[in-house]
Amino acid sequence: TCALPIYTVFVGFNSLRFDDEFLRYLHYRNFYDPYEWHWRGERSRWDLLDVVRMTRALRPEGIAWPVREDGVGNNRLEELAKINQLPHESAHNALSDVQATIALAGLVRAKQPKLFDYLFSIRKKNEVMKIVDSGRPFVYSSGKYENEFEKTTVVAKVVNHPDKQGAIVFDLRYDQIGRAHV
């Protein structure tokens, strides 16, 4: 059994695809349920990287956004902290990254409170699936999309995924008729 308090929200920067995998493995190696820590007792996870992507794409006002030399947007924590003068002593140092993540969350919340609160309200998978299953197009941010659109696009659900909990979506920026014959 997990001794963490109920209603805990685990917030990180690129944590869903990186840190959480280490935590799961740590639990597994020590004979604990590798998933219980983030769902039991109304616990949840929230990845600020996707919040940053969505904010940059939809509501960038009030936040300085770093750009690489080639003109492409950069959402690295250390660059966001530097350009916005947030505390971040040493990139990839655990405590420093935590402090920068907290400061960045505070900045997004201060500059774009409605978007911040909305994204926080849909942090759980069941809330996201309500949007996905609504039958309406929705805005989606993912590292799998191009930088040209700040890794954000409008998609529509095509079908439930056959093997996983989730859905297969179609990027509505592309011609649907031409792709139907593929």
Regions found by a protein language model. Give the residues of each.
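Short, small-residue-biased leader/transition segments that mark boundaries at the very start
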Residues: 2-4
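Metal-dependent phosphoesterase core characteristic of DEDDh/y 3'-5' exonuclease domains
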Residues: 6-114, 119-122
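Acidic two-metal-ion nuclease catalytic site recognized across multiple nuclease folds
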Residues: 106-181
